Amino acid sequence: MARYTGPAWKLSRRLGISLTETGKEIAKRPYAPGQHGNSRRKMSEYGLQLQAKQTLRHMYGVNERQFNRIFNDAGKMPGIHGENFMFLLEARLDNVVYRMGMARTRRAARQLVNHGHIQVDGARVDIPSFRVKPGQTISVREKSKNFVVIKEALEVAPATKDFVTFDAEKLEGTFVRLPERSELNDQIQEQLVVEYYSR
């Protein structure tokens, strides 16, 4: 399944959750778009599981094949499958760039990585799905340090999560550790995703 490239606000309203984690998309109209959007039907158990999966997939901007592969990798780790799955999604390079405040959205962060503006431990990496390891340093390439998009994003960036650090002067940060579940979006129901794949 291809990656969704339409308006994030429209998809957020359809899924009933803020995919950008700002809450702005659904603050004024907390119902699905369209003529009958204000009347949500009661979902089946399968429908809830599917929606949880689609919500998580769209939030991190991952296509179906990548999503499935990350889910399987999470199943090989010790601990809770669903939580490990979210931790691996958080360790994607595009997401770490977003968490550090260098991009306003994960989609914008993915573009920065794709276009070669980002380095990992001093080496250029242009693969958004690159899995960042704890302790690795993420920085902006020297020739990209005056990039307006990055500067504008940093001006409005929220405080960084405790599992990343970022120096706005050097445009450099560290992925300190994998996050704890309590540090991530509490509206995500990752256990429903596990149930979806366990059918």
Curated annotation (Swiss-Prot):
Q: Name one Pfam family in it.
A: Ribosomal_S4
One Gene Ontology term from the biological process aspect of the record: translation
| Limits of the S4 RNA-binding domain | 91-153
Q: Which organism is it from?
A: Exiguobacterium sibiricum (strain DSM 17290 / CCUG 55495 / CIP 109462 / JCM 13490 / 255-15)
Q: How does it assemble?
A: Part of the 30S ribosomal subunit. Contacts protein S5. The interaction surface between S4 and S5 is involved in control of translational fidelity.
The record ties this protein, via PROSITE patterns, to: RIBOSOMAL_S4, S4
Its biological purpose is as follows: One of the primary rRNA binding proteins, it binds directly to 16S rRNA where it nucleates assembly of the body of the 30S subunit. With S5 and S12 plays an important role in translational accuracy.
GO molecular function per UniProt: rRNA binding; structural constituent of ribosome
Q: Report the GO terms under cellular component.
A: small ribosomal subunit
Report the gene name.
rpsD
Q: What is this protein called?
A: Small ribosomal subunit protein uS4
**What NCBIfam families does its record include?**
PRK05327.1, rpsD_bact
| Family label | Belongs to the universal ribosomal protein uS4 family.
Keyword terms, alphabetized: Ribonucleoprotein, Ribosomal protein, RNA-binding, rRNA-binding
